[in-house]
Amino acid sequence: MEIEEDLNLKILEDVKKLYLQSFDYIKNGISSSLPSDKKFLADDDIDLSRITFLYKFISVNPTLLLINEKTQAKRRIFQGEYLYGKKKIQFNIIAKNLEIERELIQFFKKPYQCYIMHNVQVFQMLNKNKNNNVVEFMDSEDLQSSVDCQLYYLIDESSHVLEDDSMDFISTLTRLSDSFNSNEFVFETNYSIQISQMPKPLNTTHFKLLQPKVVNSFEGVILQVQEGKNILQIEELIDQVYLNSRRDRFYILKVANGKNYMDFIEVYLVYDNEDQEAKQQLQFYLKPFQRILIFQSLKHFTKNLKLFMISFFYSSGVQPNNSNVKNFLVSHKGVEFFSRFDIQKNELLCKDLIKSYNKLPLSNISKLLEDEGVMIRSNMKFQVRVKKVKYFKIRLNCLNCKQEWTVGLKNCINCKGQQSYISYNIQVLVQDQHFLEQQAYIYLYDDLAAQFFNITESEKKELHLHLTKNETFIQLYYSFNKDYPLSIIKFKDKIFNKDITNCIVAYPFADIDNKIFNSQQQIIQDENLRIESEKFIQNFTEDNNLQESKLYYEKFKSKNKQQIFVNGTYISTNYSQGQKICLKPIPCLKVMYVFPQEDIKLSALKIIEEINQLKIQIDQLN
């Protein structure tokens, strides 16, 4: 098709806006898969000719019919144009069956929608009858034998990596256009927008990018679940919502994270925020899921497009083990801030967020923490009530030198370190059960971190009383090292009369199965080996610049408990029992060792050796 120089400027401008809005989120992923001469550079001018991932539907005419001479089946034609730079390619879409057609009619009601299609087939349109708007077309079985026209989806929204096959899309379309001597094609979708019609396995992305002018904001939920038995719960929930509501009310976006589709799946239920009935229905069907972690909000696709998301923790302790999906957000009454996310993948987003969140009025933060007091109590394991926020600050720090990190840089300016973490400095006024107001410094952390504190009821009371007398400073750091995402917890105080100066915990491994362990103990009584182990740990600490976080046996001198932090792994010993177990189902606490006598010394080298063996086994399984 000839290039149209007089392309409608408004449409071009719309596409450019959409592209600019999504550019920051996808440029790194696209660059990794494009040929070297087409890689994006951070300061590149936007070249519209590089847009290979948007289908632009300029016009839809559902009154135009297709007819199959063999079956006499009639299908509506959805006319559209694919915009590639300044080149405009016309095409048509037909549905494979009436159910899909109804979904498409609802989907194409709104103008200027950009939609990414998957696993589509190109048809040659034959013998177009201009009088009665009827077009004959071949069956897909006949066509496949004569034309190589299988195409794959262009982009996976979650990983932002273009599939290799998609790079040939334009050349394929152009080649077909030249060979057919026609500007029109039919794209047949193999599944509908309805989630139940999506093909198995769940390795496709269904993603819709909306113009801000069309929809001011959307609401929805995100269901996060690992592939396995719990996916059935998600499917049942989706089916319930669909069976009991108008199907055109909800848009379904199902995302398989990254290239390892067995790792993690996100299911988005998106609906118009003005549709109160849809909101109520969704809330009704979410009631059975009692373990809702946090209510979330994400401004991701456009400035005016909001997806309100809920993360679900199931009783089995499902937790994503991919650092790229640790994007937890907290939202309440318009107050939004990140609880945890991958800085390296979201540098620009991080920069904007830190600027905006640090400008939030303290009254809003105070209201947030006050209303979410239950959450804080359950996480912190003591009974306090936030009364007022006196100070709030979120910033990036270097994990090595602890100095503030310049957003956008890959290395720390001060020490050239490569790991950064987000810190939340929130000074609050808390109120205990006796209504004694005391000042406390609390660095927020989520329920995962709380699991590191194996606090009994009696200890909880002791900690509770302690808070009424002294200031307690608790700080949680998250780093984003790919192999060892360490969580460093620092206590600058004595909690329930125990010195906890520094300790280090982490969850770098995939879930460990119980059967890997057995009840036979490897009891190390050699004093020389014990000394060698402690020396190894000390050297490890110095080599890894962890002077502030001494890596050694950290003992809790309470009753019969001892907790050890070795090589970034949380290990608990309990002398009241006699078998060694792996703590499940909480994935972040990887290994629990239980021994019969308190005077037994466990070798750190042995622990590290077992952990490394487990890592090898896990890598082999993956």
From Swiss-Prot:
Keywords: Chromosome, Telomere. Signal peptide: none annotated. Disruption phenotype: Telomere shortening without affecting the accumulation of TER or TERT. It comes from the Eukaryota. GO terms for cellular component: chromosome, telomeric region; telomerase holoenzyme complex. It is found in: Chromosome, Telomere. Its main location: nucleus. The keyword Phosphoprotein does not apply. Component of a CST-like subcomplex of the holoenzyme telomerase ribonucleoprotein complex, which stimulates telomerase complementary-strand synthesis. Telomerase is an essential ribonucleoprotein enzyme that copies new telomeric repeats onto chromosome ends by repetitively synthesizing the short telomere-repeat sequence 5'-TTGGGG-3' using an RNA template component TER. The CST-like subcomplex (also named 7-4-1) binds telomeric single-stranded DNA and coordinates telomere G-strand and C-strand synthesis. Component of the telomerase holoenzyme complex, composed of the catalytic core (the catalytic subunit TERT, the telomerase RNA template component TER and TAP65/p65), which is associated with two heterotrimeric subcomplexes: (i) the replication protein A (RPA)-related subcomplex, composed of TEB1, RPA2/TEB2 and RPA3/TEB3 and (ii) the CST-like subcomplex, composed of TAP75/p75, TAP45/p45 and TAP19/p19. TEB1 and the CST-like subcomplex are tethered to the catalytic core by TAP50/p50. This is Telomerase-associated protein of 75 kDa. It comes from Tetrahymena thermophila (strain SB210). The lineage of its organism: Eukaryota, Sar, Alveolata, Ciliophora, Intramacronucleata. The gene is TAP75.
